[in-house]
Amino acid sequence: MSTLYRAVERGVYIVPGSPITMIIKCSDANWVVDPGLLTNRRDLLRSALERLSVEKYNVLLSHTHYDHLEALEALTSSRIYVTVLEYTSLLSSLVRNIVTYGFTQLLRILGVRSIDVKKEMVEIVDEGFKLGDSCGELLNLSGHSPGLTGIVFEDAVFVGDAVFGEKLLSRVGIPYHFNARQALSTLEKIKAYAEKGYSGILSHGPFANSDKLAEYVDLNAERLKLIRELVIDHLTQEPLSLEELVGKILGELRAEINAGNILLGSVTVNSIISDLLEEYGLSTEVSGGLVRYRLTRK
């Protein structure tokens, strides 16, 4: 078996990494899904494509986070396909960074490069779009990002960043989700596929049979629900700034408390706080140069 890639279904190949890259060979089109990071993909993808005799191909981006698209410049694709809610973020790194992180300082901390794509190269697709005849169909998995897309194959489902493996969850503590409530709904959708016997292809995690996919879905759902409970517990007891709150939660989850985990985790926690405003009141106070939040029962 090639060390460059692994066949997981007829015409579907995984190039290992975090995130993984998929190469899909259809009768009428070839696809590279999520080129990944440039540092470990430039030569690897070219070698895999050559080994698989793939000369012409399109690129499909599950979403536009930098770790999934940075290696675009190493490829010579015909077109780049993306969902409508990810379109502007693909064209503009400024929009991408504001939508993803809320500001731009985090880019230097994470070592993110600014990549802009010309609109003439881009095609907009939506849920139900078929990659080819019996070759996979797009599935809306929004939550991690506004327009995250998965792919349903004959016996497997590509879940992108909607489901994370144990190692990543252990490392980051708080999984990044633009909309935590929507992410939970998406997990329920994926669980239904697992219960039908579909295997799971995770961007950041191992290939999973249906039973293991169901376990991963439950693990991710339980983590989001636990974080919600911790947000309520802390903010009903004392006022905290967003970063103070995230730091406390990371400590309780036994994850590393570093700048990246705090800043990325803040997006998820802020989303949870916004949802809680349907059930709780929110008060603010300023002390020590920080805006601190407190939840009060209505």
What are these regions (language model features)?
Residues 11, 24, 34, 63, ...:
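Divalent metal-coordination and catalytic microenvironments
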Residues 14-15, 25, 47-55, 71-77, ...:
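Alpha-helix C-terminal capping segments
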Residues 30, 59, 79, 156-157, ...:
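Hydrophobic "anchor" residues on beta-strands that sit immediately upstream
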Residues 37-131:
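Active-site HxH/HxHxD metal-binding segment of metal-dependent hydrolases
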Residues 37-39, 137-142, 146-216, 222:
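Metallo-beta-lactamase
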Residues 211-238, 291:
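Short alpha-helical segments that sit at the start of domains
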Residues 230-298:
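C-terminal regulatory/interaction regions
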